[in-house]
Structures are given as C-alpha cells and as structure tokens.
Design a protein with these regions (language model features):
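A structured beta-alpha segment of the ubiquitous adenosine-cofactor-binding alpha/beta core
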Residues: 248, 252-289, 294-301
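A short helix->loop->beta-strand "cap" motif at the edges of active sites that frequently abuts
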Residues: 124-127, 266, 310-312
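Glycine-rich phosphate/adenylate-binding loop
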Residues: 115-121, 133-146, 164-170, 175, ...
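Short acidic, glycine/proline-enriched helix-loop-strand junctions
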Residues: 113, 171-199, 231-245, 264-266
Length: 448
C-alpha cells in the first residue's frame, strides 16, 4: 500500500492556517486543488496549488464539533477539478482540540459521502481529506478504490516545515549519542527530522563532496549522489575522501565508500549519471531537498525546473574565481541560492543564461570554435581551491539547517573574499519569469 506526502508552498500554508482558525471555536474548512506525482514505488505526492474558499452558504452544518459541506460546495470543487485536471482535497479544523487530530465519526461519514460523490466524476485521480488541529495534521487519500494514509505534510518555503503527523512523530525512538552536541543546539525533534530526510546531491566535486560529508555527519537519513564523472588527478586536491588509488574510479562510488567509513546510519545511493542526459527524475522526486553542486548551466537549469515544478527546495551552490589578463585575482566568490515555491528562481536572478546553455549542448568542435572567436568563455579547467569550495558547501548546509529550524528569511547568500564583503538578501520573483507559469505543474511539462 502506498503512503502519501502533501506539499504546500510555505506562504500558502501559513495563510491557510490563519484563515481556518479565524472562526475558532467553530470548525472551518475549504477545498484545496493539487497536482500529484509518484515519488517511488510506494510513495506518492500531492502538491497544493490552489485554495477554494467557502462562502456563507457553503456549509450544511458548521459547529464546534462538526463541519459538513453542502452539495453545492462539493460540486464547485468537482467542477474546478474537472476543468483543471487537479485533485480535490477537503480540509477542515478541530480548533478546540489540544491533541494530535483524528477523524471523528461525523468526519468519517462526511469523507464517505465526499469520496463517493467526487469519485463518480473524478474516478481516475486521487481524492483527499485532511483535518488540522493546533497540535498537528492528519489525512487520508482515496485512490484506486482504497483509503491510504497521508504520512508527511511539508510546507516548502524558506522555512521548511515538516508539519506534525501523528504516525511520524516516534518520540520513543532513541537518538544516537554521537549527535549530542548538535541536539544541544537544535533539540531532539529537529534531529529526528534530519534523520528522516532524503537529500539528493547533484555534482560531487569539491563542493558536492563536502556537502555529502557534512550532511552525513549531521545524520541525514538518506543521500542520493548523482555525478557522471570519475576521479582525475586534479580532483585529489578538492574532493573529500579521494585518494591516490582512486584516480579513474567513479566519484559517486569513491565518496559513498568514504561516507560509509565513518557512518552506517546514513543510507547512500550512488548513481553515475548525467542529469542532462539520463533519466534521473524519479530519483530526484524522492528528495526532500536537492543540492545543486555543478557549474554546468544546463544541469542547473534542469534542477531549477524540478524545484519549481515539483515544489522540492533546491539549494544551488557555487564558487567563482576570476583573474584579470595580467594574472591578478579580482574576484573570489562563494554563493548559494535557495529556490522554493515562494522565492525567486535561478532565471529570476540571472544565474542562468539561455545562450550559454544552448552553447553547452553544441558538439565540442563547435564550442571550441566559439571560444577561439571570442563568442564563448571557456568553462574547462576553471580555477578552484578546497578552502573556497568548502565555504560554499558550509553555506549550503547551514542554510538547510536554518530552513528546518525556522530561522532564515534570505534566499541568497554570497561571500566575496577578495574585498571582503558578505551579502545576504531575498531577490524578488521577476515579473514574467517562466517560473510563474511552471510552479507546481509537476509532470504536465517534461523537465528538459
């Protein structure tokens, strides 16, 4: 049987809760519209893109212990779902409860009638019902003729909230004593959240390998490592865990072996694949967060699309060292940018260049010709050093920790070491950017 995850844009979830509890002590509710996708053989995801608010005549009954929608309100949701191809989710509150929520007998009767009515027209898509109290959230999905549990609810914004679902909060699970120092900082529940996370890292060079080591040491539950390349001699100065005897071996396997040498608690999956050519989308969709650690613009554009279409936060990390013609270094930069449903994407901040991406796809001979003619800057063998790639990796990992502890407001951080200067800001979503059309559309557009 499948389990389900529901992802809200962080800002939408915050506004939704404010609205739902505004009628307290009476129950309140609405319909949500969501796209859905599979995130592995036994897990599916609903991503909320729209809210249908009630009017004064949307309830057959609204009291402190029950809430029943009218047939008209249900029909309104059916029509919206039928026209848009989205999945309807009925959500309501138990505002007076100070316990983790569960469906009452009235709720169960409402769910039965709701699913029966919706299924007559929307039989090929999942149908959901959620109840929220001040102590958490629970829900079910009716799909393929059976009820399945919602086991995870995430509000994906700069604050990456994992909303409490009763089945997920196993407070009896014992934490390994090796995490004592960080538990003293963040507390036991945050450590348990870290240990439940699945994180993909695309690009396992100096930055990506450092990210992998740091995430493993803080106890992330599973890492998915993706890189097509093998260790070269010049990688030995930057790639964590690499040795002289590793030259010629795949980066992902070398780093996986290194991670296993100091931790057995983090599961590691190593994929020697090219994110621009190989089908790795199904693996990326299993992630709670994606780290982009590649300087290839084509792969960064793909990860940007995955993030905005599927509501999976992306932490894009990078370094840049620029030298003048006379050999003097005039720029040493480590930077990260977080892409979420609520923040600017990489196109918004001009971190991506359409012409440069097109040039990357050209045959090598044509790329070399453009470089010789001065129409393209060579991206081969760019200067790099472990001290800088490690700074970028640490910025990214610290940003993730800030996101899950609700302690960040900025989506972009940049350190210019040659001046030096530290910049932290939240760029605005650019008017007319393609991300506004692609947010939350999931598989309706192929990621290319």
């Amino acid at each position: 049987m499948r389990s389900w995850k529901v992802i809200f844009p962080g800002s939408l979830y915050s506004k939704l809760k404010d609205f739902l509890f505004s009628s307290s002590p009476k129950e309140n509710g609405c319909f949500l519209m969501a796209n859905h996708y599979k995130a592995g053989p036994t897990k599916s995801v609903l991503i909320v893109t729209k809210v249908i608010l009630p009017t004064h005549n949307s309830w057959q009954h609204a009291g402190e212990s029950s809430l029943v929608p009218t047939s008209e309100f249900i029909n309104k949701a059916v029509i919206e779902a039928d026209v848009t191809g989205l999945c309807p989710i009925f959500v309501h509150t138990h505002p007076s409860s100070h316990h983790p929520p569960s469906f009452s007998s009235v709720d169960q009767s409402t769910n039965f009638r709701l699913f029966q009515n919706l299924n007559e027209i929307l039989s090929t898509r999942p149908l959901g019902s959620i109840v929220i109290s001040r102590r958490g959230i629970t829900g079910v999905v009716f799909s393929d003729g059976r009820l399945e549990e919602i086991l995870q609810v995430t509000a994906a914004g700069l604050e990456l909230k994992n909303v409490q679902v009763p089945q997920m909060n196993d407070t009896s699970s014992r934490l390994n004593s090796k995490f004592d120092r960080q538990v003293r900082i963040y507390g036991e529940e945050i450590q348990r959240l870290i240990q439940r996370m699945t994180v993909s890292i695309v690009g396992l060079g100096g930055t990506g390998s450092s990210v992998a080591v740091q995430l493993t040491r803080i106890g992330v539950g599973k890492l998915i490592l993706i890189d097509k390349d093998s260790i070269e001699e010049t990688n030995l100065t930057r790639v964590y865990g690499s040795r002289l005897t590793d030259v010629g071996k795949t980066k992902v396997e070398v780093i996986k072996k290194h991670l296993r040498s100091f931790s057995r608690s983090t599961k590691v999956e190593a994929l020697q694949k090219d994110v621009t050519k190989d089908d790795v989308l199904d693996k990326l969709l299993q992630s709670d967060v994606i780290f982009g650690c590649t300087d290839n613009l084509s792969s960064r554009a793909i990860l940007n699309d995955v993030s905005i279409q599927y509501y999976i936060p992306l932490i894009d990390t990078g370094c840049r060292i620029h030298k003048l013609p006379n050999g003097k270094i005039d720029q040493i930069v480590a930077k990260i940018q977080v892409v979420t449903p609520d923040t600017a994407c990489l196109w918004c901040t001009d971190s991506l260049d359409g012409v440069a991406i097109l040039q990357e796809t050209l045959p090598e001979e044509e790329r070399r010709k453009l470089e010789l003619e001065g129409y393209r800057e060579s991206t081969d063998k760019q200067p790099s050093i472990i001290s800088l790639t490690s700074i970028a990796a640490s910025l990214g990992v610290n940003k993730l920790l800030q996101m899950i502890t609700d302690s960040t407001t900025d989506s972009r951080t940049e350190i210019e070491l040659s001046i030096p200067i530290f910049i932290s800001d939240r760029p605005k979503i650019k008017q007319g950017c393609i991300c506004q059309k692609r947010r939350g559309i999931a598989g309706l557009r192929k990621v290319t």
